[in-house]
Curated annotation (Swiss-Prot):
GO cellular component: chromosome, telomeric region; Ku70:Ku80 complex
Leading EC class: hydrolase
Chief place where the protein resides: nucleus
Keywords assigned by UniProt, alphabetized: ATP-binding, Chromosome, DNA damage, DNA recombination, DNA repair, DNA-binding, Helicase, Hydrolase, Nucleotide-binding, Nucleus, Telomere
Taxonomic lineage: Eukaryota, Fungi, Dikarya, Ascomycota, Pezizomycotina
Membrane-crossing residue ranges in chain numbering: none
Protein name: ATP-dependent DNA helicase II subunit 2
Organism: Coccidioides immitis (strain RS)
Superkingdom of origin organism: Eukaryota
Subunit structure: Heterodimer of Ku70 and Ku80.
Length: 731
């Protein structure tokens, strides 16, 4: 279970925070909120109910907090609780965004705001185990009552609260920042806050450093969850007394980090008055989070899916009737054919397995090829607080390590699951030892391919040719070698010893972290453009400038020797306007063999025949006729489709038609077709509800041909995007 957290952010919204200082183009409050929003949205993005947040406003126009309401003590005036401690969601972020604005007063005590935050944490956490934290962000220009700081420090330590104080333009020798011509009043306040942070064993620093460190992605620390708990067996203990059984646990060692998945929403259409919209059972089963997110916006609603099953029935309206899922037999696709397998036959394909990790063999480590790894790595450790298992597994690990052997195992993570072949390699460190585990392929998964050699050509007669136009010359090999040396990333220190210039811990995935940054930014700033990509994420997207300069000459020589030439860009509309090369004899073999032009496209082989028909004509009427034939074939495929069995063929046909008509510069023919097809799909005129087909068209981006795809089109990009919505359009 994840550790419970309670964090209170104290945000200074005084009148002085509305000014721009330090050469910045944004106010001190907006600059400060860059850090605060980053921390809050990071917490919200985890989705954990145990990660709670509270927000206190310092130097607000009014006073709204329990300590003020109790006795109306002046020390707690101009302090407002913007957000009580609890899980923060998107509606809370929107509410907080409206509250955080510069006030009209500079009255408010920062020390008292810390007391208020302590009170909030004590009341919420009680005596339960929480990770408690207070973050004060201020410009240090408010009045402060430093009496009783010692008791505040004692309470912070007693409650186990971590105190972090960040200041706008605070002096920080460790970071190397000092504000010139500082107001003596602010200097005194900085000194008071620094003493408070130091005495409470907290952190004190300047806001500039915190904002700068925001661009560096934070490494997510996750709690290990065992993916397998069971026996590691050598031999069968149930049959042989010499069999060995060790209780072990399996954890991820490496895991692929993926960006957040997108959720599907549609523009909502308000129902008639007095009519409510019913929630789909599928949506409700998937949880309430999607529905809450959709309802939070007035313009979006969650996408609801409904699946129906139909079979051909000549007596039913439309030639098909709907059936229940329970009335259907299970089948598998074999090409375009649905193959039925009965339950009795399907049992044969399933192995009756028992959860265990079993040794089935050993190999020398030098004989193992790294390309056999098929998965991320896991670690196998002995069962915790089981000294006998720890000692037994340690003996096995040391034996494999000393003999330089790897073990081959058969892993079944749960009863009834298919087995996996795994490699087990020993790992021994100073304070840790385990077996590293990766998945191996079965014999049926391996394919052996033979490729021709790269340094010679063997003719049909068996002659070996070492000088050929397809083989690199000695000069080319030498120049390429020089270029590779100049591109070497190795770096050396002043003593000539190599060091790692691209440390693994300093390399981040731009895809994962940029999308995460964009989501968190858009949650707070729905209309502002995204901030620029941080340099730490761009570092691996561009060549180092020093390396480019170093390899410039060798690259120029390589281009010259290898005779690299720029390929001209592909011309649009080339198919109709291209002049064919005239043979010297005057006889065109293609014309002689082509025969008569194709007039009719058959439904059995529509795509090749459609292309052939277009290739054999330059008459616009013939092209239009071919488009009409192809349109009728696609509509018949959809109309006669049993479920979605013909949808892939129809999508392929639509894509081919779009590609060919772009090449022939006839966007109008395709746009007229796709408009009519959308209308028929949404009006259920192609054999019932075919909205899933329209969803596939949208997914494949087969909408209108716009001006971006073809300059002569009269459809703008905005019109093309609007057309791909699920609503009827007049584009």
């Amino acid at each position: 279970m994840a550790e419970k957290e309670a964090t209170v952010y104290i945000v200074d919204v005084g009148h002085s925070m509305g000014k721009c200082r330090g050469g910045r183009t944004i106010s001190d409050l907006d600059w400060m909120m860059l850090y605060v929003w980053d921390r809050i949205t990071t917490t919200v993005s985890t989705g954990r109910k145990t990660a709670t947040v509270g927000v206190v406003g310092l130097r607000t126009d009014g006073s709204s907090n329990p300590l003020w309401e109790k006795d109306e003590e002046e020390s707690y005036a101009h302090l407002s609780v913007f957000q009580e401690i609890g899980q923060m969601l998107m509606p809370d972020i929107r509410k907080l965004r409206d509250l955080v604005k510069p006030s009209n007063t500079n009255q408010g005590d920062a020390i008292s705001s810390i007391i208020l935050a302590i009170d909030m944490i004590v009341r919420y956490c009680k005596r339960l185990k929480y990770k408690r934290k207070i973050v004060l962000v201020t410009d240090g220009r408010s009045t402060m009552d430093s009496d009783g700081i010692d008791s505040i420090v004692s309470k912070i330590k007693e409650e186990g609260i971590e105190l972090v104080i960040l200041g706008v333009d605070f002096d920080d020798p460790d970071y190397g920042f000092k504000e010139e011509d500082k107001d003596p009043f602010k200097t005194k306040n900085e000194s008071v806050l620094k003493i408070l942070a130091d005495d409470a064993d907290g952190a004190y620093g300047t806001l500039a450093q915190a904002v700068e460190e925001m661009t560096t992605p934070r490494i997510k620390v996750v709690r290990g969850i065992p993916s397998f708990r069971g026996d590691l067996r050598l031999g069968d203990p149930s049959q042989y007394s010499t069999g060995l059984t060790i209780q072990v646990e399996r954890y991820y060692r490496t895991y692929v980090a993926r960006p957040p998945a997108a959720s599907a929403f549609a523009l909502s259409i308000a129902p008639p008055k007095g009519q409510s919209t019913a929630e789909s059972s599928v949506t409700l089963q998937n949880g309430d989070s999607t529905v809450e997110t959709a309802n939070a916006s007035n313009n979006l609603s969650g996408v609801r899916n409904a699946r129906s099953y139909q079979v051909i029935d000549e007596n039913a309206p439309g030639g098909k009737k709907e059936v229940e899922r329970d009335d259907l037999a299970k089948g598998y696709e074999y090409g375009r054919t649905a193959v039925h397998i009965s339950e009795s036959d399907e049992v044969i394909t399933k192995l009756d397995t028992t959860a265990a990790l079993e040794f089935i063999g050993f190999i020398q480590s030098e004989n193992y090829e790294r390309y056999m790894n098929m998965s991320t790595s896991n670690v196998i450790i002995a069962q915790k607080i089981n000294d006998k298992a720890i000692l037994a597994l340690s003996s096995m690990i040391h034996a494999l390590f000393e003999l330089e052997y790897y073990a081959i195992g058969r892993l079944v993570t749960k009863d009834g699951k298919p087995p996996l072949m795994v490699l087990l390699a020993p790992l021994i460190e100073t304070d840790f030892e385990c077996l590293l585990e990766v998945q191996l392929p079965f014999a049926e998964d391996t394919r052996s391919y033979r490729f021709p050699p790269l340094d010679k050509i063997v003719t049909v007669s068996g002659k070996v040719v070492k000088e050929h136009r397809n083989l690199p010359s000695d000069d080319l090999l030498e120049t390429m070698g020089k270029y590779v040396e100049d591109m070497d990333l190795s770096e050396f220190d002043e003593n000539g010893d190599p060091f790692q210039s691209l440390a693994l811990e300093d390399c981040y995935s731009p895809l994962v972290h940029r999308i995460d940054q964009a989501i968190r930014w858009r949650a707070v700033h729905p209309t502002k453009p995204l901030p620029p990509v941080p340099k730490v994420l761009e570092k691996l997207s561009h060549w180092p400038e020093e390396l480019v300069k170093k390899s410039h000459d060798s690259l120029r020589d390589l281009i010259s020797i290898s005779a690299v030439k720029k390929v001209p860009p592909k011309a649009k509309g080339r198919k109709r306007r291209r002049e064919a090369d005239k043979p010297l004899s005057g006889l065109n073999v293609d014309d002689l063999l082509r025969g008569e032009k194709r007039l009719k496209i058959s439904p059995e082989n529509p795509i090749p025949e459609f292309k052939q028909t277009l290739a054999n004509t330059e008459d616009i009427s013939a092209i239009s006729d071919a488009v009409k034939q192809m349109s009728a074939i696609i509509e018949d495929q959809i109309r006669q489709s049993l479920g979605d069995i013909n949808y892939d063929r129809a999508i392929e046909g639509i894509g081919t038609m779009r590609e060919e008509l772009i090449a022939y510069e006839e966007p109008g023919l395709y746009n007229d077709f796709i408009r009519g097809l959308k209308e028929k799909l949404l009006d259920d005129k192609l054999g019932g509800d075919r909205r899933e087909m329209w969803w596939l068209i949208r997914k494949s981006r087969l909408g209108l041909i716009d001006q971006k795809a073809l300059d002569i089109s009269d459809i703008t990009e905005e019109q093309a995007r609007e057309f791909l919505s699920s609503r009827p359009t007049t584009v």
